[in-house]
Structures are given as C-alpha cells and as structure tokens.
Amino acid sequence: VVLEDTVTGEKRDLAIEGLFVAIGSDPRVGLVENQVEISDERFIKVDGRTSKTSLPGVFAAGDVIDPTYRQAITAAGSGCVAALDAEHYLSSK
C-alpha cells in the first residue's frame, strides 16, 4: 500500500497482508425516521442499555445506535442484546 502524507505530500510504501476499508460512518435511519425517536446526531435513541426504541416492539442495534465505538464487534454484541430483548418482548405477549 502506498501511504501519502496529506500535509507534506510525501509518499511511502507499507507492506501489508490485509486491509479493512471504512466505507462510511453515517447511520442509516431512513427506514424508521418518522416512527422512532432519532437523536440530533442521527442515531436511533434506545432505552438505557437495552435495544428498546420509543416504539413498543421495535428494537435497534449496531451502528444506528452507537455514536461512540462504531465497531463491528460492538454492533454484533448489540445485535445479540436486540435479539434477546425482542424474544423477551414476544414471550410476554
């Protein structure tokens, strides 16, 4: 990979075996925009450490709720939380 210093323009080679490319960090909340509460930063608001949104029976997880870490592993963990919250919600009905 060729790295370029954006200040000096200097280029240098870096030998690597793999590369992760970040393709964006804007949460995509359009699907639920007018149905659940959205923060000013455009993230879906959830109730504390749960995945419960402002609309009963709708749960959110991953990058659309996480303005801090934005990592695949934390998104996967919040997906598990959402699945468990949804299971609990459905079993109580």
Regions found by a protein language model. Name each.
Residues 7-9, 36, 71:
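Short, Lys/Arg-enriched charge-dense amphipathic segments
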Residues 15, 22-69, 78, 88:
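FAD-site-proximal beta/loop scaffold in flavoenzymes
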Residues 5-7, 20, 24-25:
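Short glycine-/small-residue-rich Rossmann-like dinucleotide-binding loops
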Residues 1-13:
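Conserved beta-strand-loop-beta-strand element in the redox core of flavoprotein oxidoreductases
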Residues 73-93:
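Internal hydrophobic alpha-helix adjacent to the cofactor/substrate pocket in enzyme cavities
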Residues 13-14, 73:
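Non-catalytic, surface-exposed connector residues within folded enzymatic/regulatory domains
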